[in-house]
Amino acid sequence: MICTFGDLSFASTPAAHTSSLDEQEVTLNFFGDWAPSSGRSQIGLQHRPDYLPETLSSHLNRSDLNVLNLETTITQGPATLRATTRLFREQPSALEFLKSHNFNLASLANNHVMDYLEVGLEETLKHLDSFSLGHAGAGFDRDTIYQPYRFEKNAEKISIICVADGELGNEKFNNGVGTADVTSFRVVDQIRKSKAEGCFTIVFVHAGIEFLPYPPPFIQDIYRNLVAQGADCVIGHHPHIVQGMEFYSGAPIFYSVGHFDLYREGGRTDERLGLMVSLGLLDAQLTKVNLLPFRIEEHNINLL
C-alpha cells in the first residue's frame, strides 16, 4: 500500500512495480461538505475559473469516481420551511460545477438535505437526475434510502453506503422519509450484502460533534463497528473540521475530512481546512491512500 499526505509518499512496493499497476488501479476521491453559497455574499463562485486550483481539478479529471457530501438542497422553493438556525439551498445551476468537474456521486445523507422538507428533497433528486449525477442516502422509502451506490470498472466492484446520524431529517423521525440512519440495522444488512457480492465497501458518514478536534468515543465505537461488520473503509464528515484517522482491523477510518466548500465569514481557522481522500483499488484490495489538504478562502479553494 502507498500512504501519502500532500507530496509525502510511503510505498511498500518498488516504484517501477507501482507504476505498472497505476493503469489498472481504480482511483476514488472523496470530499466533505459542499454548499458553496453558504456564508457568502457573492453566490456562483464555483463557476469562476480560479475557484479550484489546477492540481485539484487534475485529480478530479483523472479519477474514476469522485464523491462529495451535498450539504444543501437544490431548490427554488419558498424561503423557509423548516425551523432551524441556517437553511441551505443552491440554484440548479450549481450542479454544472459538479458535472463539469467529473463528480459522479452526491451523498444526501446529512442534516441539511431536508431543510425544505419533502418538497426540497424531491426537487433536489429531480435536479440531480437531470444532470445525470448519482445520489444516495436519502429518499421517500427505506429501500431507496439505504440503497448503496454501485460502481464497477476494471473488474473492481465498489459499494458506497451513505448514512447520517439522527438529526431532524433522519428517516426514523419522518415515517421513512429523509436520510439514512447510521445506527439502523439496514446499514449492517447492506454492508453484508455488498461484501457477499464481492464489493469493496465504503461507508460515507455524516455524523459526530461539531468542532471537536478528535472523534468522541461513541463515534469511534460506531465507525469501528461498521468495520467489524465488514466495511473496508469509513469516511466521515459533519464536524466542520478535520479530525484524526486510524487503521482499524486493517481498514482506514477517516473520522472527519472537514469541508469541501462551506464558508463562514468570521469562522474558525480550522473550519476552513479540508481534505481530499484518494483511494487506489486493485484486485479488491486497497493499494493507495492519498490525503490532499486544502484551504477554503472567501472566493476560492487553495492547496496547502
Regions found by a protein language model. Name each.
Residues 3-304:
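Acidic, metal/ion-coordinating pockets
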